[in-house]
Each structure stands twice: as structure tokens, then as C-alpha cells.
């Protein structure tokens, strides 16, 4: 099975690691990135003859189109704004395509390519990481396992293993993607209908086992991809919130209210700068902190079973960094699900064609089994909603 991987950063490294170390049947991985240093680091880390690296601009069709010829699956681990064009190139080459998504407008453009992909006999699957991605797959699995679902709550966070100043946070994935999640509107289902609400709102507290204890969660954008449309009319209420150590939401809300998340350029002393780009650069510098990270996930569905009895079903994941192999928890929980889906596409386990909702075509049981094979502790619970969680 032949894969082309766009991006050799943190998540691209995790995807390549998984395809070469865990996925069955991989014959080649071609990694493309504009940064030669990132490619050199990838080659040194993996030390696998099946890996080939190519330095260049992923947005250049003259570079990427020949690389896609003969590939089974193309995976995008670059910033979300590249994904629609890369999907088009993969479709033209007859290769399946998936990405880590995270931006609703870009994903909508990928869905506009569905007929094009179907005609070429390929699948395009956006939003295949942690959230969006795994969270939606697990949430759909829980909700549809009930006769009627009253509430589906998805809570996910990538955090330092212990809170670190100045924001009780460390960079664990793209800073641009993080800011996008914090400022774009969030999709929810309220009273059976899809609605949008502002991000950085509806702050709540929740508890995880020690040493984490009481944490906070708040609305953010893009974490559940197409799940609201898929479950509209089938679930009374659905929302997704990002988990952080307490106090983080108020800090970032202040930055946003001051205009530091605005994308448009501002003029200063004869020059112009985008506040968002400046903020991203500063965050990358100041929040690229040492120490391991952790990923926390809680998916919880409440409703009634086929006998009309109230029931709560939940899945909890607490995943830690693989320090032996230098793979962070966020890399594991973002890159591994994407690589698992890529292998499903290459093996023919996903038979539908066109642009696809990952929650409808990726079997949750198979995903959970593959994650457990990678030593991810996926815990499943079921009980009466009146019982303690």
C-alpha cells in the first residue's frame, strides 16, 4: 500500500510513524514538506527504507501531481487552507484523500467535490484527527446505540501533563489551527436543530481522575465536523467543548476581545501586520514548553434503551506521550486515527465513494480495537443516568 503524506511536522510525523510501524501492508510512504530540516528529522526518527522525502511546496501541482500517480491514499497534515486544493489533486490522480481538517468552510468545499470524487472512484474523508475525527466517530457510536438520545456531550483537550504558566497550556498542534478553533463559531444541536453559537462561551467545570481533578471546558469550533448535520433530528442536544486547566478560557477570551485574534492587517509605523499572525508567532515561541503532554477525551450519551429505560453510555480516554519514541499524546491521538483511516481506505474497508462523513464510514469498534493495539487506553462505561459518572 502506497501513501503520500503532505506535511512532516508533529502530526505528519505521527502519521508516518504509524503507517510504517503499526499499519499492515505499507510498502511506501512519500513525505512532502517545504522544510528540509523537518524531512531530515523525520528520516532520522523513522530510519525506514520505505520512507522517501521530497522537499517542496505542497501547493505546487507540478511537484505534487507526479508524486500522487500510483498512490493508494494521500494524507494531509499541513495547515487546513491547503486541503481543498490537495483533495482536488488527489482526486485527479485517482487516490483516496484524507486530512485533519478543522475548518468548516474548507470542509464544505471538499464536500462540493463529492461528485467529482465519486466519478473517479475515490473517497475523500475530511476531519480525520482527534477532534474533528475520533471524537465524532465515538460520539456517533454512542448516540446511535441508544433507542433515543437526549444528549450527546463531547469533551476533548490536549494539555501539558501539569499546568504550566503563563496560560496553563503548551503548544501541542498548529497554533493557527488552535486560534481558528477559538474564534470561529461552534456548531451545536439544540432541541433537535443545528445552530451556531460563539466559541469561548458556555464555560463549565468537569472532573477527571487525579492528578487532573477539576478542569474547565468551553465551546470551540470545528471539533465535530459533520456530526451535527448527521445527527440532526436524531439527537435532542449535542455539543463539543475543549478541555483546559482552569483559567485558560478567560485568558484567551481577553486576547480575542482586544482584537489580537483578528486576521486582517493593521498599520503600525508605516508597516502592516496581522494581529492573529503576530499572536500565533508569539504563542509558538512562548508556549512551546518542555515536558510531556496528555490528551483527555470524554464522550457521553444519555437517553433511553429499546425498553424505554434511561441509560448513559460513555467513553473515556486518558492518553500519555510515548516518550521512548518521541511521540506526544496529541501526535498519537491525532496522527494515529488518521493513519488508521488511511489504512482502511487503502485496504478497501471503506467502500463508499465521494466525500464522506467519517462518522458514517469508519466503524467505531474497529477504530477502538486499532487504538488499543497501539496501547491507547479506551474505557467504556454504561449505566443509569442517576448514577455517578
Description of each model-found segment:
Residues 11:
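Hydrophobic/small residue at the entry helix of a nucleotide-binding pocket
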Residues 145-389:
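C-terminal catalytic/substrate-binding lobe primarily of soluble NAD(P)-dependent oxidoreductases
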Residues 3-8:
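Conserved N-terminal Rossmann-fold NAD(P)-binding element of oxidoreductases
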Residues 46-60:
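Rossmann-fold cofactor-recognition segment
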Residues 34-38, 104:
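Helix N-cap at the beta1-alpha1 junction of Rossmann-like dinucleotide-binding domains, i.e.
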Residues 62, 73-90, 105-106:
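Beta-loop-alpha module in the N-terminal Rossmann-like domain of NAD(P)-dependent dehydrogenases
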Residues 101-124:
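Rossmann-fold NAD(P)-binding glycine/threonine-rich loop
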Residues 58-70:
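Conserved Rossmann-fold cofactor-binding substructure of NAD(P)-dependent oxidoreductases
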Amino acid at each position: 500500500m502506497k501513501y503520500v503524506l503532505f506535511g512532516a511536522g508533529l502530526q505528519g510525523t505521527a502519521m508516518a510513524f504509524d503507517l510504517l510501524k503499526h499499519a499492515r501492508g505499507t510498502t511506501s510512504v512519500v513525505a512532502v514538506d517545504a522544510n528540509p530540516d523537518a524531512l531530515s528529522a523525520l528520516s532520522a526518527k523513522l530510519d525506514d527504507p520505505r520512507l522517501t522525502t521530497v522537499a517542496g511546496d505542497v501547493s505546487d501541482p507540478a511537484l505534487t501531481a507526479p508524486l500522487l500517480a500510483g498512490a493508494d491514499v494521500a494524507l494531509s497534515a499541513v495547515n487546513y487552507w491547503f486541503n481543498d486544493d490537495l483533495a482536488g489533486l488527489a482526486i485527479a490522480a485517482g487516490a483516496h484523500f484524507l486530512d485533519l481538517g478543522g475548518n468548516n468552510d474548507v470542509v464544505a468545499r471538499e464536500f462540493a467535490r463529492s461528485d467529482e470524487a465519486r466519478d473517479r472512484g475515490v473517497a475523500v474523508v475530511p476531519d480525520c484527527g482527534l477532534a474533528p475525527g475520533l471524537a465524532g466517530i465515538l460520539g456517533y457510536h454512542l448516540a446511535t446505540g441508544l433507542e433515543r438520545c437526549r444528549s450527546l456531550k463531547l469533551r476533548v483537550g490536549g494539555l501539558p501533563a501539569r499546568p504550566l504558566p503563563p496560560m496553563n497550556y503548551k503548544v501541542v498542534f498548529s497554533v493557527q489551527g488552535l486560534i481558528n478553533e477559538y474564534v470561529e463559531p461552534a456548531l451545536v444541536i439544540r432541541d433537535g436543530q443545528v445552530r451556531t453559537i460563539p466559541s469561548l462561551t458556555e464555560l463549565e467545570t468537569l472532573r477527571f481522575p487525579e492528578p487532573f481533578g477539576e478542569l474547565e471546558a468551553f465551546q470551540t469550533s470545528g471539533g465535530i465536523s459533520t456530526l451535527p448535520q448527521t445527527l440532526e433530528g436524531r439527537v435532542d442536544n449535542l455539543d463539543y467543548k475543549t478541555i483546559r486547566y482552569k483559567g485558560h478560557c478567560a485568558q484567551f477570551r481577553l486576547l480575542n476581545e482586544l482584537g489580537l485574534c483578528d486576521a486582517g492587517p493593521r498599520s503600525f509605523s508605516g508597516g502592516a501586520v496581522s494581529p492573529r499572525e503576530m499572536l500565533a508567532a508569539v504563542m509558538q515561541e512562548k508556549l512551546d514548553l518542555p515536558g510531556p503532554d496528555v490528551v483527555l477525551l470524554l464522550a457521553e450519551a444519555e437517553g433511553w434503551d429499546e425498553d424505554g429505560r434511561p441509560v448513559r453510555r460513555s467513553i473515556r480516554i486518558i492518553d500519555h506521550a510515548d516518550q521512548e519514541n518521541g511521540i506526544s499524546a496529541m501526535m498519537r491521538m491525532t496522527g494515529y486515527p488518521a493513519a488508521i483511516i488511511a489504512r482502511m481506505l487503502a485496504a478497501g474497508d471503506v467502500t463508499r465513494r465521494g466525500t464522506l462523513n467519517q462518522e458514517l464510514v469508519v466503524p467505531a469498534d474497529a477504530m477502538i480495537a486499532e487504538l488499543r493495539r497501539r496501547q491507547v487506553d479506551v474505557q467504556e462505561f454504561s449505566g443509569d443516568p442517576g448514577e455517578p459518572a
